[in-house]
């Protein structure tokens, strides 16, 4: 039953797992003997009975699968809520009736997000925090638990991306430290702070915004992808420990989103990317269905390709490595305007591999 529940399948299926189902009409025939009533063959009416059950009696028909049903009255903490995906998600869940806790560094931007939520009739609270500072995370988490008692849904969205080839990273160890600090260690520290209350209440949902990069291994993103992959692995490991506590973990391998995080890479202006609102819709669906993983078809294909043909995958990615050069900023030059526009081949490749960070 537990395995079926984790797979999102009806618990009733467990009765059909270990042995075949048999239908015996012996008792019915005995009861009807002499009455002139005969038992019809099962195949003549079984489909009608099953169809009636599916249309009228299936308990799943009566479940409210709306975002409002998933979040109304719940406390939802969103990191990186001052802009981009975080802001779009905050506006969406607040509109569905959640109490939203807005977490980010920029107080001005947080206040602007809160004003939009309140103007729409929602409820939001600001908890300013530098999510790359472990001590500040501890302070913020204590503040949240003091004021709100618990968090029902945690969305670890705040992140830092660095696009730089390994050839330009020999003397930039701090790039790896910075991405690990925010994308992995900061998220883990917040989870550790909020998890005891979730376990104590026997309910909770942690949503980690990862990247399609952990599936597709795009060149020049070694620092960024490694930090996201660390959080993915952490989530997979602790998920089994939290089953009995009814705390769910969801990893979203987000494709390229047009947010301030990708703005410094000018060539992305010409590449296909989803909007923050579309990303927020992915997160909203995760809140409703609580899946283990949310990913695009291209991301899943990239993961499969690397699993079955890693060298072929490397060859394909090497083509991308040659098509998309390091930016002037990655080379340490401040004049980003000197970046050459991407070639026709590069733009075509980016559209073919829509959503991947190049």
Q: What are the roles of these predicted feature ranges?
A:
Residues 161-177, 220:
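Conserved mid-core segment of classical short-chain dehydrogenase/reductases
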Residues 75, 82-83:
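Conserved glycine-rich cofactor-binding loop
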Residues 251, 268-307, 311, 315, ...:
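C-terminal helical subdomain
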Residues 128-139, 173:
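The beta1-alpha1 cofactor-binding region of Rossmann-like NAD(H)/NADP(H)-dependent oxidoreductases
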Residues 12-14, 22-75, 327-358:
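Amphipathic terminal alpha-helices
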Residues 191, 227:
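Active-site helix of classical SDR
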């Amino acid at each position: 039953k537990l395995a079926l529940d984790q797979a999102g399948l009806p618990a009733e299926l467990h009765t059909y797992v270990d042995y075949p189902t048999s239908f015996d009409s012996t008792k019915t025939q005995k009861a009807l003997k002499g009455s002139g009533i005969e038992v019809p063959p099962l195949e003549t009416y079984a489909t009608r009975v099953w169809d009636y059950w599916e249309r009228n009696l299936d308990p799943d028909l009566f479940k409210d699968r709306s975002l409002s049903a998933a979040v109304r009255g719940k406390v939802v903490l969103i990191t990186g809520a001052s802009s981009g995906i975080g802001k779009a998600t905050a506006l969406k869940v607040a509109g569905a009736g959640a109490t939203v806790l807005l977490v980010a560094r920029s107080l001005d931007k947080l206040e602007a997000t809160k004003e939009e939520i309140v103007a729409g009739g929602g409820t939001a609270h600001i908890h300013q925090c530098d999510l790359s500072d472990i001590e500040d995370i501890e302070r913020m988490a204590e503040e949240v638990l003091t004021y709100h008692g618990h968090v029902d849904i945690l969305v670890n969205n705040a992140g830092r991306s660095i696009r730089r080839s390994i050839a330009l990273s020999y003397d930039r160890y701090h790039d790896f430290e910075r991405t690990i600090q925010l994308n992995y260690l900061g998220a883990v520290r917040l989870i550790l702070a909020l998890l005891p209350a979730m376990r104590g209440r026997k309910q909770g949902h942690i949503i980690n915004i990862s990247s399609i990069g952990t599936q597709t291994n795009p060149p020049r993103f070694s620092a960024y992808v490694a930090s996201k992959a660390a959080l993915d692995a952490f989530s997979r490991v602790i998920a089994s420990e939290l089953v009995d506590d009814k705390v769910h973990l969801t990893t979203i391998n987000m494709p390229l989103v047009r947010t301030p995080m990708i703005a410094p890479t000018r060539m992305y202006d010409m590449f296909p990317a989803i909007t923050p609102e579309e990303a927020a819709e992915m997160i909203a669906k995760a809140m409703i269905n609580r899946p283990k993983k949310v990913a695009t078809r291209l991301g899943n294909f990239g993961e499969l390709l690397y699993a079955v043909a890693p060298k072929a995958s490397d060859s394909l990615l090497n083509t991308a490595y040659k098509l998309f050069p390091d930016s002037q900023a990655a080379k340490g030059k401040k004049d980003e305007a000197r970046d050459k526009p991407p070639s026709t081949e590069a733009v075509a490749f980016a559209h073919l591999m829509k959503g991947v960070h190049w």
